[in-house]
Amino acid sequence: MIVRRTIDKDELKELPKVVFPGRIHVIQSESETEKAVAYLLSQPILGIDSETRPSFTKGQSHKVALLQISSEECCFLFRLNMTGLTQPLVDLLENPGIIKVGLSLKDDFMMLHKRAPFNQQSCIELQDYVRQFGIQDKSLQKIYAILFKEKISKSQRLSNWEADVLSDGQKQYAATDALSLIHISEPTRRTPIS
């Protein structure tokens, strides 16, 4: 498999948009969290990402509002602004038997540590991982486009992740991001790139 190093903005604009094909579950209570984590503990690999309410005021910041964790079939959107980072989620993040893939995981975990202490295990940082195959771009959108010739829409990135109800666009965006992390890790794990 031959992989390009980079992709330009004009090329990216022309690509078809990827849409999350599975089920999306919004988790807003501790009991829902326990059920979701029970399912996720049975999966061999998970895509992990987080969203924080954007701040447009200098010096103001917010805690992580949404933790999205996806398997191949479904994505769970944990509303941390409503539940906090509960013990079942901490146990999942610390579980060494489940591979967790992400992009800029260091930043995600740094922000999540503000909600609760934990020692994440079995994590793959995709920015480092894809570099060994010659991919120089670091954004999720560009890495995905290089590998799959589809683009991930980023129109919801700066939306209010602490809203009382997430819009369909926000749910689709969050789930697509998390699943795409698994997809990025797959071809590079299976196929030697030359």
What do these predicted regions represent?
Residues 45-58:
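Short acidic, Gly/Ser-rich segments with clustered Asp/Glu that frequently serve as metal-coordination loops
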Residues 23, 95-100:
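Short active-site oxyanion
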Residues 47, 99-105:
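Acidic beta-strand-to-loop metal/phosphate-binding motif
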Residues 1-46, 115, 126, 179:
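N-terminal accessory regions of nucleic-acid-interacting proteins
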Residues 145-185:
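Acidic, Mg2+-coordinating catalytic module of metal-dependent nucleases/exonucleases
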Residues 126-146:
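Short alpha-helix plus adjacent loop in nuclease-associated cores
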Residues 182-183, 187-194:
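Single conserved hydrophobic/aromatic residue that forms the stacking wall/gate
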Residues 56-73:
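A short alpha/beta connector and helix-capping loop motif
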